[in-house]
């Protein structure tokens, strides 16, 4: 069953999809990002704080947003195997929404830009708000905070490419690929997935009004780096 943001957050605005023609594509310069992470990690931490603030910082450039999100992967684990992240799906599937929200907040305390934790926090609140049989101490405005932050990250990923072979979307984890496809581009059905060179290629069974091509490319340089580091 598709769990779209618009369905679950019936009081919230739908995701802000930026038309490709309206923005410049800015590929991630991994060498530069890693250099900043090693030589000036506080700069990335400051940018992460700005990107994850409750109120959007309209002075941030796209380059700063990119440095914040992708640079964070060098400072903290923000993939789908990090501490506490693995528990989120289990708690959500068991409909333990209060516990899921609490677990998501713990992940976000370490990495405020974890897409998976933001998704679970937002959806947990959405389910609790809609549940008329229980009184939960949460409000739709709290869910909006997580929703807004998630949307900023999606827009940041969207700025790095257009999904083509020439301009793939850059990600730091496989989980981010599926989060981006489902909750930003409304792409749910895939035929197969395979990797070549530095890209994951996903063949789609169906397209959406946000993405009309049958193939979508994700640049996975950082994903491969992290996998290799697990075996070193």
Task: Identify the residue ranges that each predicted region occupies.
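N-terminal alpha-helical interaction modules that lie
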Residues: 20-103, 164-232
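Hydrophobic transmembrane signal anchors and adjacent membrane-proximal interface regions, especially
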Residues: 3, 19, 28, 138-140, ...
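Alpha-helical protein-protein interaction scaffolds
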Residues: 64-153
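N-terminal secretory-pathway/extracellular module detecting exported/lumenal segments
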Residues: 108, 159, 182-184
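Long, positively charged binding patches that form subdomain-scale interaction surfaces
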Residues: 141-179
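Short, flexible active-site-proximal loops enriched in glycine and acidic residues
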Residues: 14, 114-118, 156-160
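Bacterial Sec-dependent N-terminal signal peptides
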Residues: 1-25
